[in-house]
Every structure is written in C-alpha cells, then in structure tokens.
Amino acid sequence: MNITNVRIRRVDNKDSSSKLLAYVTVTFDDCLVLHNIRVIRGQKGVFIVMPNRRTKVGEYKDIVHPINQSFREILQSAIFKEYVKENPANFELELV
C-alpha cells in the first residue's frame, strides 16, 4: 500500500499551551482516505495520533491504527515530510 497524498491543515494556536499542531488527511493508493490524524507536540517531541473516539466509560479507542511499527514509521515520516515542506521556518522536528 502506497501513500499517494498527504494534506496538512495547520492549527493556528493563539494559546501557546496548545499541543495540537495540525490535522492530516492521508490517501493510500488513490483509493482510500484516512482523515483526522493529529500532529501533537508533546514533552518529548512531536508525534502523530490516529483518529479515535471516546467510549461511554471515558476511554479513547483508535478507529484505525497501524498494525506494526514499520508502517507507523513510514506514515509518520510522510506526514512530517509534508508538514516541514509547508512550514520549514517554524518547525523544529524532534520525533518521539
């Protein structure tokens, strides 16, 4: 499965304490689209959060997620590459 498109929707945070940097849409093989991946700045660096929902008991469950670490790294790399390309001056890449 190939990543054929990555679209970044940056979040302009006026509140510097906000950790959300962007929402991402990824297209696979020009036939499957995954919306609402989030780019988050944490204490240890930047990482992605897969789309999730809150259950009735308050837990968050991923709707979709990579099955193995190698695909997660491919996905994260493609997202960060596009993010940096769109915003080179204001992004210090420290991956988690």
UniProtKB/Swiss-Prot annotation:
GO terms, biological process: division septum assembly; sporulation resulting in formation of a cellular spore
S-S pairs: none
This protein's UniProt keywords: Cell cycle, Cell division, Septation
Coiled coil spans: none
Pfam families in the record: SpoVG
Superkingdom classification of source: Bacteria
HAMAP family cross-referenced by the UniProt entry: SpoVG
Family statement: Belongs to the SpoVG family.
Function statement: Could be involved in septation.
Protein name per Swiss-Prot or TrEMBL: Putative septation protein SpoVG
Gene: spoVG
